[in-house]
Amino acid sequence: MEAVLTKLDQEEKRALQDFHRCAWEETKNVINDFLEIPEERCTYKFNPYTKKMELLFTPEFHTAWQEVPECREFILNFLRLISGHRVVLKGPTIVFTKEIKNLGIPSTINVDFQANIENMDDLQKGNLIGKMNIKES
């Protein structure tokens, strides 16, 4: 999966944050119900030891997410929220590309299946600093 990221304005970002607050649990439930497995398939949490936010997926989610529209939408909304950018799908590879290139901000975000997001203060302000790696655990 590849996506193009363009900057969100403040109103769009607030609307997305409101949506994300309301939709987080519901989205997880939809994914879990779709996969018909009673255990939780994804978790979003702050790791106090590494000081990073983590988005964790199980192997079942890993194999299903590209084929399940709810899984794709969940990941896109998550990336929109934490990056403060619009995300537009461009193909089947798992690479996200920033449209605006600034010094200190990476042009590519490699995505697998455990998100370790650096510097939450900057992310909450809509600045993507460092790299988001999602790795299968």
Curated annotation (Swiss-Prot):
Query: What is the species listed in this Swiss-Prot or TrEMBL entry?
Result: African swine fever virus (isolate Tick/South Africa/Pretoriuskop Pr4/1996)
What keywords sit in the KW lines? Host cytoplasm, Late protein, Virion
Give the family from UniProt: Belongs to the asfivirus A137R family.
Where primarily located?
virion
* Induction data: Expressed in the late phase of the viral replicative cycle.
**What GO CC annotations are associated with the protein?**
host cell cytoplasm; virion component
Q: Subunit structure, per the record?
A: Interacts with host TBK1.
Classification of source organism: Viruses, Varidnaviria, Bamfordvirae, Nucleocytoviricota, Pokkesviricetes
Q: What does this protein do?
A: Plays a role in the inhibition of the host innate immune response. Mechanistically, promotes the autophagy-mediated lysosomal degradation of host TBK1 and affects IRF3 nuclear translocation to block type I IFN production.
Q: What is this protein called?
A: Structural protein A137R
Compartment(s) where it occurs, according to its Swiss-Prot or TrEMBL record: Virion; Host cytoplasm
